[in-house]
Amino acid sequence: MKQFEIVTEPIQTEQHRDFTLNPHQGAVVVFTGHVREWTKGIRTEHLEYEAYIPMAEKKLAQIGDEINEQWPGTIVSIVHRIGPLKISDIAVLIAVSSPHRKDAYAANEYAIDRIKEVVPIWKKEIWEDGAEWIGHQRGYHDDAVERGQN
């Protein structure tokens, strides 16, 4: 197990949480993002994730560095799963510990937002009647809407 990694097997929640444990930390916040069945009114059968693994792991570590700069004293572990995932499977886990809970919560939320912005991970949504590759986790359509280009 690495502190920041891309995996193909189910995510081991306790291992990544335990990585952040430290006698000086008073709070550990663990976020797990799961495959949901419904997105924008469309029923999802499953998802498939792909990543450029060396760059994705580098970007996950970069996010960890950003968190350590903004919230000194935090310890971060981030793992994202790739390959086919069923409904309710864990796709991403972020564990952040800090001396106090406020920083752990804020850093954890920052991490998931940054993952969606900078980590080269793509997902394919498979529905009952079709499929679509999403350019990155926020999706090209959402980016175009935000820029007024839809």
Curated annotation (Swiss-Prot):
The keyword Transferase applies. Keywords: Molybdenum cofactor biosynthesis, Transferase. Substrate binds at H34, V35, R36, T44, H100, R101, K116, K123, K124, E125. It catalyses: 2 [molybdopterin-synthase sulfur-carrier protein]-C-terminal-Gly-aminoethanethioate + cyclic pyranopterin phosphate + H2O = molybdopterin + 2 [molybdopterin-synthase sulfur-carrier protein]-C-terminal Gly-Gly + 2 H(+). CDD domains: MoaE. InterPro entries: MoaE_sf (IPR036563), Mopterin_biosynth_MoaE (IPR003448). SUPFAM superfamilies: Molybdopterin synthase subunit MoaE (SSF54690). Its EC number is 2.8.1.12. Converts molybdopterin precursor Z into molybdopterin. This requires the incorporation of two sulfur atoms into precursor Z to generate a dithiolene group. The sulfur is provided by MoaD. Heterotetramer of 2 MoaD subunits and 2 MoaE subunits. Also stable as homodimer. The enzyme changes between these two forms during catalysis. Belongs to the MoaE family. This is Molybdopterin synthase catalytic subunit. The lineage of its organism: Bacteria, Bacillati, Bacillota, Bacilli, Bacillales. The gene is moaE.
